[in-house]
Every structure is written in C-alpha cells, then in structure tokens.
Amino acid sequence: MKKKLKWIGIGIGCAAILGLAALIWALDIPHWQTLDLNKIQNYQQAAILFDGNDEEIAVLAGAQHRRAIALEEVPQHVRDAFLAAEDARFYEHRGIDVWRIGGTLLANMRSGEYSQGASTITQQLIKLTHLTSEKSLSRKAQEAWLALQLEREMSKDEILEAYLNIVYFGGAGSGVGAYGIEAAAQTFFQKSASELTLAEGALLAAVIKSPSGYSPIDHPEKALERRNHVLQAMAEYGYIDEPQSQAAQQEPLALSVAEIEQLPYGWYIDAALAEAESLLSLSADEILTGGYRIYTALDAQAQASAEALFQNGANFPDPAEDGTPAQAALVALDSESGAVVALIGGREYNIRRGLNRATQIARQPGSALKPVSVYAAAVDAMGYLPTSIVDDAQHTYAGGYTPGNAGGQYYGKVTLREALSRSLNAATVELANRIGIDTVRMYAQRLGVELDEADRNLALALGSMTQGLSPLSLANAYLPLANGGMWSEAHVIRRIEHADGRVMYEHPGQTERVLSQQSAYMLVNMLETAASSGSARALSATGFPVAGKTGTVEMGNAAGNRDIWTVACTPTTVVSVWMGFDEPDAAHALPEGTGGSGYPARLAAQFLAEIADRASAGNFALPAGVTQALVDGLALEELHQPLLATSLTPKEYQLVEIFPDGKVPRETSPYWRIPETVTDLQASLSAEGRPEIRFTALEEGVDYVIMRTIQQERRAIATLQGAPGETLTFVDEGASSNQAAKYSILPRHQRLYEMGRLVTGDESEAVSVEPRRQWSWLFGG
C-alpha cells in the first residue's frame, strides 16, 4: 500500500511539474517584461516629427499637451470620482483585486452599465506604460504580475498620481487629445484640475473609459449619462452622500472648450501619423505616447505656400446656394523618390485627424486618368507614336456605349498628341477599343491604379471607375511619366526611430520600372503640349516647362460637375489638385463651366510658381533612343502621316516631333517644295486668230502664271490651276492682232503666295506667236 501511495505521489509530482511547465510555456513567462519604473515616473514620451531637412516641426502629446500635477493639488472629490469609476478598492488591494474580478459581473448586471472593469488602477497604469492592447492570457498575466511588483515599489498615492498624469482623456475642438488630468481640465473647462467641481471631476473620470465614445464634444448625451453613473457610484461607495450626488447630476456639462494652440502643417502631420500607425501596426494612442521620432519628407516652404493658397477663397469655386463650400485637396510629390513634400486635405484645418481629402477620399478621375491608362498602354505596349493617327468620331460600342466629346464637336483623323492634349473623348475610347481594355487595365494597375473587377469596360478609358482615386493615388500614378518610367510608392515618412534610438522603420527607397524610358518621355512630351496649348494651358502661367492633364467629371443625372482635377509634372515635382463637394448632389454641384482646366489648373500653376526653386528644373531630358525631327504639320493634318519639313515650310507648320530611333520619317512633305518647271508649253493661233497656249499641269498647289512679252513689255496676263496631268489651255483675247508675242509659264507656290510669300520655280522656255499677215489667206499663207 505504501509502495502504491509512493508511486501515486510521484505521479502527482510529475503531473504538477509538467503542468507548471505547460503553464510557463503557455504564458511565455521567460519573455515577460520586467518592471521599469522609469516608464512610469518619466512619462513624457512625446512623438516628435521632423521635416525633410531633419528640422523639428511638431511635438505631439508632449509637454504642451500633458501638464503634470501633484496628487495633493487634485481635490479629494476629484480623486474619489476616479476611484469610484475605475477602482473603488484601490487603497485596499495590493495591485490586483480578486474580489472585484468576481463581483464585477454582478455589479455590471445590476447597474445595466459598465461602471467598473476588472482591471485595477495599478493594472491600468502597467498597461499604459509597459504593455500593448493585445488581448491574450499571457498579456493579462503579465499585467497582474507587474502590478503586484509595482505595488511593492511605489506607494498608493504615487501610483494614483502617475495614473492621473498619464491617462488619455480625448480631444476637443481643433486641439489634439489631452493626456493627464491637468491638460484635460484646461481643455474642457479652461481651469486647473485643482479647481474642478464635483460634477466636472466626475465628467473627466467618466470619459477615460472611452475617450471617443464618451467625448463631451462629439457625444454630449452619452457623456452626461456616463458622468451621472459615476456620480451615482460615488454615492453608493460612500464618497459622497445621495443629496450631493443628485445635485451634481442636475448640473449641465458646462464645457468651456479651450482653443488649443494650432500646430503647423496640420494636414501633413495627420497623414504622417496615419502612415506611422500603419507602418508600425500601432494605435494612435501608442504612437502619441511612445516617444517615437518620425522623420518625414515635408518641404516646409512648399507646405507653407500651399497653405497660403488655400486660405485665398478666390482660388476656389463659389459655394453652393446653401453656403456649403466647395472643397479641395493638393498633393505634391518628389518626382524621383515619390516622397510627399506637401499635402493639403481641405479648405480649412479645424479638427485634428479629420477627413483628409488628399489621402482618404476616392473620386472619379475623369480624363486625368487617360495618360496613365489608355495612352500609356498605346505607347508602351502597342508602339503608338505622338504622330500616330486615331479617329475622333462618334461610335457606338458593345452594350450601346456611345461616348462623346465635350461640346459635341468631332475632328476626324487626329494625332495621338492632339487627342491627348485636347482631351478628345471619342478618339480616346476608339484608341482603347483598338488596343483592348485588358491592356488598358494592365497599364493602369502597373502605374499603381487600383481597379475593381467591374472596371473592365471602355468607360474606364474616360476615368469611370468603381472606387475612384485619391489625389495622392493619382499623383503617384503620374510619377513614372516624370521619372523616366520608374515608379515608387508615394510616402510621407522616411524613417521612424524609437525613443531609445532604435530604427523602427526605414523607407526602402525601392523603385520599379513600369514604362520604358522612351515611352515615358513621349507621354510627358504630349502632356507638355496639353499644358502649353491644350486643355491644361493654364499651367503655362508658371513660366517654366510643365506637363499636365485635367479631368472633369459630370454629375450625370443633374446639371453641373462633381469632380474637377489637374495633375501637373515637372522633372522634379508632381502635383495633383482636386476640387468638388464632400457630398455632391443636385444642390451641391460645380457649375457646368467649371472644369479641370479652370480653378485646379490655375491653383497648380500658382503653387508650382511659388516653389519654383524646387519645381523649375528645365526641360524633361531627351532619353537615348528618342530623336527629335522637324515635321510638316500640314502633311499630318491632310495626309495623316509624319513627313519632314522642308526649307520652305512656314514656321506655323513646323512641328518638332519625337520618334524612337528607327522610326524617324525620311520622306519630305510634298506641300512645301519649289514648283516644277513646265516643259511642254505650246502656242498657236486660234481659229479667230488669237494666240492659244497649251501645257500640262504638274502638281497640286501650284499657280501657273502666264507671262507675255510684246516688244520690251513683259507682264503676267493670267493664272491657271489644274490637277496633275491635266492639259491647261489659254486664249489670249487681249493680244494685238498685228504684233508678235512671246509666252512663258512661271510656276508659283499657291499656299505660300496666299500667305504673302512669293516662291516660284524656274520659268519655262518662251514660245513665240506670230500674227497672221494681212491677205495671207488669199495666197495660201
């Protein structure tokens, strides 16, 4: 029996050892954090942001947002409010409250309100300073273990003071969130925490459970209800009596919201924080309290210029009849790296982390999508050139789709350059139909445009998409056009460092070739035409080379436009500008005459001119493999083929065009040549005895000037035209019947003569006509 009990004991011991080992493994105890009092006692862990030159631009949730206060300065009724709301047995337990864990469920069920959680104030302080928000058994066990240790290292009052100075209370108005009770009192009541009333203290104790959900600014009714629950709990726990509780519950919220100092570059900073949260997989609270040093790509001068332009109402369309302002956004990227150098998310910046239209909206880009979808595919995949011809005529495609040009005018056979620079819808859709919508989709996606599976129709050629694009995404898609075909992801942040100096993130600087260098140049060169004389010609106001494209999206079932765009490129900078209403409808639409070529293009031009030191970098570099050639515009217009200009081609018809090596035209234009000499001139007398001359017309566009010489007098007596090979005849009715005359033909360039320029070929050899001798018919002469 003893032997049996011995083995049972051994078995139980082994099981206990194995169970303990399993528990240690499950809770990952060897990797638990150790208590670090420095994190609690030195809690100024602000996030610091730097610009592209490593100059500090903002300190978030740092000294100016958290104001430390000693516990003895906090009124007892305020301390009691936090104890009633968060940990009524705070001064009785040793870090964890075993009784409370069991009683919490009953208390919550009885009150119908989550008046208490299971975590003590000590545990909450540990979570705020040592742990993440991860919900796991290991994290909860660490929290309890560290709370027990903390209670041995710090007094209850020290723990409560640290908690009140660290906990987050949310934000108000245009300010960032308040950290610590002193900052919260200043934010919501414009007074020190030492002056808080019972009702005010209870409100602050109420909001920390969910600073956004119980925000007295955004959700005053919920905040009031939660405050009154805290006041009721104070009475139940004996901190105040029932009459005091009821009296305080009758008081209104009585907020006095502070106008917190406006931080500079608000839109840009918001974008940086959002990107940091995504890169590090952290919450906003963790970023703002973690002591991170965030190095951005901000160009402070460019951002300041953009902000100044957005403060001028004359730069934007008129508001709707009900006063709702038209909104706008701007993004500027470094062409080489994709770094965001400036960003504006709306007309006014009046709330931290509000809707950032530069990054968060998705709108139809309209014709602004054409260069990075249809034309990119045509040039890079199919070998189209700026001089290639496409038909600009109204067609009906599968499904009854019948796109039309703005204004209802069509131009027949046009070059790709003309179709893109003049934003001809019919020509663009016909081009997309030729090359195939799958190829168009492939190139749009290659340039970073996210498409839905439903975006597989010809309407995509005109920028009709299921989801739409943000100004940032559209600017990013244009990046390869300005950067020789290389794409890199647009980014705000260059590097993030932890408070201890560890590099948490470094932008990889990766680039990807999405277009050939030659294709990118041809595309941006065509967009230079759009910016100088086409739909985006307002960009020419910069005074330096710019390429660009506009976009206008109609309302559809109502009059007016819903979105207007301009994207502008220089060799160093890409700028995207959007304008429209946040919630477009029949009453909130831009007027029909307000398109992308207006306000957005002018704003983009002003912005680029303001940052000329950055944006002005001369011409886009002609890459190897591309050749410039002087071609005849008339031949392109009438013969629909690129032919070389001649020395006679008028300046207004001389076009500098670009061609890949091997595709440069070799033939010259037939329109601007010295006329050929007539070689078959004949002359005789007509039946009436008048000089009659005959010759063959040799070419189009030539005036054949008939020259007559009688004795010493030489004069032009007539001008004839004819088709090549046609026999031309002229009877000189004005000739004298008794004088000999000589006739010749002077070929004259018809078009040049009409333009005021005399260009002739060699005069033909003269032929003579003798008059009939009188009475010669009697003698057979």
Q: How should these model regions be labeled?
A:
Residues 1, 547, 551-781:
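Soluble, non-transmembrane domains of envelope/secretory-pathway proteins that act on or interact
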Residues 2-311, 315, 339-340, 393:
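Juxtamembrane regions of bacterial inner-membrane/periplasmic proteins
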Residues 46-57, 74, 294, 323-351, ...:
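A short, well-structured edge-of-sheet supersecondary motif
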Residues 81-83, 234, 306, 337-338, ...:
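Active-site SXXK
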Residues 91-101, 178-179, 241-246, 355, ...:
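Short, well-structured active-site flanking segments
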Residues 110-134, 191, 261-264, 383-440, ...:
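Conserved catalytic neighborhood of penicillin-recognizing serine enzymes
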Residues 296-320, 330-332, 343, 350-359, ...:
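A penicillin-recognizing enzyme superfamily signal
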Residues 401-405, 436-476, 489:
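Mid-domain, small-residue-enriched loop/turn segments at the edges of structured enzyme/sensor domains
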